[in-house]
Amino acid sequence: FKFSCPRRMTAWAGTPPALCLVPCITLFAAVLTTISVQAVKHYHHFELGLYFRGAFLILGIRLLLVTILMFLGQILTNNRYVGFLIALFYIVGQVVMDALHYQHHLYQVFVLPDTTYSDMNGYGHFVKPFEWFSLYWTIFAAILLIAGHLFWVRGTETAMSIRTRVARGRLGIPAVTMLALFVIAFVTTGCYIFYNTNVLNHYSTDDQRDKRSAETWKLYKK
């Protein structure tokens, strides 16, 4: 018995990094493909720092966060088809929320602000909101990973009652402490973001911004 817990913990701890390695390899291959195409077209001013920042920080973190969410779905269901269904619901849910104008990144799970890059200013000030929301949702992903560890079982046991009993057995002082710290950090970061986006500044949806831009264009057109 004393050897089974370390093996179980090792198996769980190795799964999330292995899953996250898949999008990382894909992005690395995309960067290499970009460089190869540029070289074939006789362009040799390679901006490797920009490529890797755009791929792994701007795009990569989005993929990693969604990977963790899908990983938790597989843990809770232990069924690949139900896990695929959860992924489909997540994608459709984001589309529905956009259509209903619920677009705030504080509650659109793992949806990060867009970043704009220009040759003159680089990413400029657009990267700051991205960094804060990335921190916010990364903390939430850490909470999901802890929950995943609590409900993780090996073998064919799929009953939620068994998973709940296993989770209660693992919910010791270390797990509770880590959960509490991450929840406090998550709430604190969310409050700071809300203060900056909704109190210090005026928050508006995409449609509201488009309408304001159209009105400004009509005004100055005269």
Language-model features: where?
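Interfacial transmembrane-helix boundary/kink motif in multi-pass membrane proteins
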Residues: 8-16, 163-174
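Secretory targeting signals
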Residues: 17-78, 116-119, 129
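Membrane-water interface of alpha-helical transmembrane segments
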Residues: 52-55, 124-134, 172-179
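Cytoplasmic membrane-interface regions of multi-pass membrane proteins
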Residues: 1-3, 7-9, 70-74, 149-164
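Terminal transmembrane helical anchor/hairpin motif
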Residues: 43, 81-166, 189-211, 219
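Alpha-helical transmembrane segments and their helix-start/interface "positive-inside/aromatic belt" motifs
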Residues: 75-88, 173-182
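Hydrophobic membrane-insertion alpha-helices, especially the h-region
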Residues: 178-192
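Helix-loop-helix units of permease transmembrane domains in multi-pass membrane transporters
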Residues: 1-25
